[in-house]
């Protein structure tokens, strides 16, 4: 079943084009939204989450048109949204924060609402921290708390804006496990700078650059864009689209290889860089685009 159908979405801020002719389809599973800073990822997520209207194009979420008041209300009842800034009130406890979100989501019956709050806190592993003040929680716990708030009401569409940013490796792994489980049952759209998130989580990936969709397909297809265009050498080579020194001391290059180059298997990051990036003399960081 098609969860989200976007056709020709556009948005301008004065003379600045934020999005132009953006089209894509979302179904059950996890879709990653990759792109450099300023590509329009957060803007696009906010449009899908009905927090921002588009200037042009059409959007349907489970058949509803969010450009109309009835459609917007219907969509909001079907989605959960984790923005980059969840709007925590530091004096709230974990339970109080999620309970507040549940009230905003129209769960008015107190006993039913508290049962739902307990359910989502348990789902993200925070059942034993429900009475903790938010200011006492670690960064990873706060991210899980924000996810719990997004899951109130068991939404069919979950939108996550860079959910793993700022997490240490262990926290990132736990968060990915939660998202992967969601993707088995829900439609999940997440923005990320981490190609490792895409490799470990996503069935589909969209690459956005300068407000336009540059790619829509599977992670394997994204990596395949760099087939025959990735090689390594002992030293930097001029003329490569992207070139960086790896942890092994070798330089990895993306572009048009010279004769006799030592070609290697392309990664998702290589495919991404083929589309949007120029990297020179940068150290490779596992799972990240540089």
Language-model regions, residue ranges each:
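A short, flexible loop at the N-terminus of ABC-type nucleotide-binding domains that lies
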Residues: 1-21, 27, 69-71
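Helix-to-loop junction immediately C-terminal to a conserved catalytic motif
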Residues: 49
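Conserved ABC ATPase "signature" region
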Residues: 99, 103-106, 111-129
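Conserved ABC transporter NBD signature motif
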Residues: 4, 57-68, 74-75
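Catalytic Walker B motif of ABC-type/P-loop ATPase nucleotide-binding domains
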Residues: 158-162, 167
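Hydrophobic anchor residue at the start of the ABC signature
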Residues: 147
């Amino acid at each position: 079943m098609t969860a989200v159908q976007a056709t020709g979405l556009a948005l301008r801020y004065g003379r600045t084009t934020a999005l132009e002719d953006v089209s894509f389809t979302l179904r059950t599973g996890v879709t990653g939204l990759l792109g450099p800073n300023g590509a329009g990822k957060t803007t696009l997520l906010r449009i899908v989450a009905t927090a921002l209207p588009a200037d042009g194009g059409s959007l349907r979420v489970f058949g509803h048109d969010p450009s109309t008041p009835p459609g917007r209300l219907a969509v909001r009842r079907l989605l959960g949204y984790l923005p980059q800034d969840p709007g925590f009130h530091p004096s709230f406890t974990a339970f109080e924060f999620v309970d507040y979100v549940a009230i905003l989501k129209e769960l008015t019956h107190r006993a039913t609402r508290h049962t739902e709050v307990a359910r989502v806190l348990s789902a993200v592993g925070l059942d034993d921290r429900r009475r903790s003040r938010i200011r006492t929680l670690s960064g990873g716990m706060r991210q899980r708390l924000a996810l719990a708030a997004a899951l109130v009401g068991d939404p069919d569409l979950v939108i996550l804006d860079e959910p793993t940013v700022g997490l240490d490796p262990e926290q990132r792994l736990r968060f990915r496990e939660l998202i992967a489980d969601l993707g088995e049952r829900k439609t999940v759209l997440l923005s990320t700078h981490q190609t490792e998130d895409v490799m470990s989580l996503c069935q589909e990936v969209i690459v956005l650059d300068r407000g336009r969709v540059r790619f829509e397909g599977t992670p394997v297809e994204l990596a395949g864009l760099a087939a025959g265009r990735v090689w390594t050498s002992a030293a930097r080579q001029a003329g490569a689209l992207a070139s960086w020194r790896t942890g092994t001391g070798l330089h990895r290059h993306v572009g048009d290889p010279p004769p006799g180059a030592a070609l290697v298997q392309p990664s998702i990051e290589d495919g991404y860089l083929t589309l949007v990036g120029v990297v020179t003399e940068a150290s490779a960081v596992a799972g990240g685009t540089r």
